[in-house]
């Protein structure tokens, strides 16, 4: 599994002050642009892409309805993504499929979509249907992150992930059970067939995240002969 770490600057100054050396052990950088005001995103973008030039980067606008920090209309959401993607060509573009389903066809020009679904309230009973619909669209990555309230929620998501990966070996999946009880899903990504795990540096971007340094230690232990 690859380790993803999010950067969440709230201003141009914060973006310029990012110490990239602290992110060297991350495999992929996620820029959570939703921590900025809508009108500041394009002003901050050059600093982010310059800082992390040569690194794999995900551009993410996490809206409030999926646990993020920004409120945008469907049109604003797609327009911002297209503008940033057109100028800077991020390696991956996060698209909240179920929240902006009516705009999905406008995103088909991008071959590097991370079709995502986030639920900070629960692990819904229709997880299989959610995974099935996202998988049927054959994006670059299928990403599902849901809140776990008990051990069964975690085991269900891990089992679904393993099953979908077995049936769709060419498809990249990223699945996360959020919350303390779900931490095992972050550690066991290789076991379930999840391609990435999200780790934190300074501030967690979701409940239950483990620090980058601890995730590296866990990887070393699991990879010992």
UniProtKB/Swiss-Prot annotation:
SUPFAM superfamilies for this protein: Aldolase
Subunit structure: Homodimer.
Key words of the record: Amino-acid biosynthesis, Aromatic amino acid biosynthesis, Lyase, Schiff base
Catalytic residues (positions): 118, 143
Source organism (scientific name): Streptococcus sanguinis (strain SK36)
Stored CDD domains: DHQase_I
Family listed: Belongs to the type-I 3-dehydroquinase family.
Gene coding for it: aroD
Amino-acid positions noted as binding 3-dehydroquinate in the UniProt annotation, renumbered to this chain: 6, 30-32, 62, 186, 205, 209
Classification lineage: Bacteria, Bacillati, Bacillota, Bacilli, Lactobacillales
GO molecular function annotation: 3-dehydroquinate dehydratase activity
Any one of the GO BP annotations: amino acid biosynthetic process
Name of the molecule in the record: 3-dehydroquinate dehydratase
Reactions catalysed: 3-dehydroquinate = 3-dehydroshikimate + H2O
Functional note: Involved in the third step of the chorismate pathway, which leads to the biosynthesis of aromatic amino acids. Catalyzes the cis-dehydration of 3-dehydroquinate (DHQ) and introduces the first double bond of the aromatic ring to yield 3-dehydroshikimate.
Stored HAMAP family: AroD (MF_00214)
Pfam families according to UniProt: DHquinase_I
Organism superkingdom: Bacteria
UniProt pathway: Metabolic intermediate biosynthesis; chorismate biosynthesis; chorismate from D-erythrose 4-phosphate and phosphoenolpyruvate: step 3/7
EC assignment: 4.2.1.10
């Amino acid at each position: 599994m690859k380790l993803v770490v999010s950067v969440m600057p709230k201003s141009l100054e914060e973006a310029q002050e990012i110490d990239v050396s602290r992110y060297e052990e991350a495999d992929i950088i996620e820029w959570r642009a939703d921590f900025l005001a809508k009108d500041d995103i394009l002003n901050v973008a050059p600093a982010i892409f310059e800082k992390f030039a040569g690194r794999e980067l995900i551009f993410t606008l996490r809206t409030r309805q999926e646990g993020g920090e920004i409120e945008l209309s469907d049109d604003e959401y797609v327009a911002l993504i297209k503008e940033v993607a057109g100028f800077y060509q991020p390696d991956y573009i996060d698209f909240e499929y179920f929240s902006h389903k009516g705009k999905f066809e406008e995103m088909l020009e991008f071959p590097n979509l991370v079709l995502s679904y986030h639920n900070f309230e629960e692990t819904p009973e229709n997880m299989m249907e959610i995974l099935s619909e996202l998988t049927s669209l054959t994006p670059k990555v299928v990403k599902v992150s849901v809140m776990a309230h008990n051990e069964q929620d975690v085991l269900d998501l891990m089992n679904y992930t393993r099953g979908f990966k077995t049936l769709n070996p060419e498809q990249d999946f990223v699945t996360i059970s959020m919350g303390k009880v779900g931490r095992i899903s972050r550690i066991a990504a290789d076991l379930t067939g999840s391609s990435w795990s999200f780790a934190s540096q300074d501030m967690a971007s979701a409940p239950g995240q483990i620090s980058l340094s601890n995730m590296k230690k866990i990887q070393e232990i699991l990879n010992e002969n």
